């Protein structure tokens, strides 16, 4: 995999050039010559004046190559139970840094011109089971993921006055996920389903000398618990119609929006309730729904894009009717 700035916003930063305008003279409006910094000729035009010295052997591409593996073994102790174990790898390719070559005030760290891939090793054990004479299906997995060289964007003025990225930390993730669907044999028309996720995430080692990333912090968008539950009950009406009612619930524990402290914000926990009820025939159907029954101001996401705090909320209490007709 090869990535570079050619034809991108970084490759033609304020110069209106790039692959879309090949005849354009490479002249930057504000003196920011990103294209010259990464053109592979071992010199830095205008940047040489700014820094006082040329930097040699600057890469013009970030290249990654290798092999990732996935291995799965399964075992059936009975016709109703499947057990499996999976070992898998993953990665994200590296990239180039705009402020490559900048050095921290104490000289202990230099922003890399290109940073490396981050790598993930995942260990998983899972099961799929039909229980209670086939009336219940219960699936789940327990897993651990180890991340080496986690790519992170950092803003630390003691190093550079621009955001830069590096393999800034190692991290671990452990968790359990499960889902269930159950149709009790002694209650005709009732179906109960739900899901549960438990997570424990942690930065285990900081690789860049900055306070932006801290050992022991959790990863971004990783709530310790998420759950959902719904129960649908159906019954027959005169004339062959079917009626149904289904209350449902979803919950998320608190989480954080980023791993770097300057952008890290708490996303509060929330619980949302809802209900649907309706009638269905062979030709038509009508359903009343109420989502977010308690009008919970649920925070789904937070970010600091363009240095402004932004919060994405769930829709407020919403009521409506769905109508269907089969031709």
Sequence positions of predicted segments:
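Signature of Gram-negative outer-membrane beta-barrel scaffolds
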Residues: 1-78
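Transmembrane beta-strands of outer-membrane beta-barrel pores
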Residues: 1-2, 87-93, 100, 131, ...
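Gram-negative outer-membrane beta-barrel transporters
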Residues: 135-146, 164-259, 322-326
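Outer-membrane beta-barrel strand-turn architecture
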Residues: 67, 75-79, 119, 129-133, ...
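Short sequence motifs at beta-strands and strand-loop junctions characteristic
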Residues: 59-67, 116-119, 168-174, 219-226, ...
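Hydrophobic, lipid-facing positions within transmembrane beta-strands of outer-membrane proteins
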Residues: 67-71, 111, 121-125, 174-178, ...
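Membrane-embedded beta-barrel scaffold of Gram-negative outer-membrane proteins
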Residues: 76-99, 114-176, 180-183, 197, ...
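C-terminal beta-signal and adjacent terminal beta-strands/loops
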Residues: 207, 249-260, 278-327
């Amino acid at each position: 995999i090869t990535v570079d700035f050619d034809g991108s916003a970084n490759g033609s930063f304020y110069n209106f050039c790039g692959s879309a305008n090949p005849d354009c003279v490479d002249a930057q409006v504000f003196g920011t010559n990103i294209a010259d910094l990464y053109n592979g000729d071992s010199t830095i035009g205008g940047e040489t004046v700014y820094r006082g010295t040329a930097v040699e052997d600057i890469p013009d591409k970030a290249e990654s190559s290798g092999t990732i593996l996935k291995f799965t073994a399964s075992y059936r102790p009975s016709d109703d139970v499947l057990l499996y174990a999976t070992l898998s790898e993953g990665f994200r390719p590296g990239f180039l840094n705009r402020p490559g070559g900048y050095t921290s005030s104490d000289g202990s760290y230099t922003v890399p011109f290109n940073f490396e891939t981050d790598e993930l090793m995942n260990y998983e054990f899972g099961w799929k089971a039909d229980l209670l004479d086939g009336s219940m299906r219960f699936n789940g997995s327990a897993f651990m993921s180890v991340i080496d060289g986690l790519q992170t964007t950092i803003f630390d003025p003691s190093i550079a006055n621009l955001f830069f990225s590096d393999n800034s930390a190692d991290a671990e993730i452990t968790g359990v996920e499960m889902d269930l669907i159950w149709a009790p044999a002694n209650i005709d028309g009732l179906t109960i389903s739900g899901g549960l996720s438990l997570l424990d995430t942690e930065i285990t080692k900081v690789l860049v000398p900055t306070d932006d990333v801290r050992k022991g912090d959790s990863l971004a968008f990783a709530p310790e618990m998420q759950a959902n539950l719904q129960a649908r009950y159906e019954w027959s009406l005169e004339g062959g119609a079917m009626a149904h009612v289904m209350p449902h619930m979803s919950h998320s524990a608190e989480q954080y929006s980023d791993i770097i402290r300057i952008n890290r914000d708490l996303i509060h926990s929330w619980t949302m309730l809802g209900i649907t009820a309706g009638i269905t025939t062979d030709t038509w159907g009508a359903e009343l729904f109420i989502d977010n029954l308690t009008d919970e101001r649920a925070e789904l996401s937070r970010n600091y894009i363009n240095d402004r705090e932004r919060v994405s909320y769930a829709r407020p209490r919403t009521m409506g009717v769905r109508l269907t007709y089969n031709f």
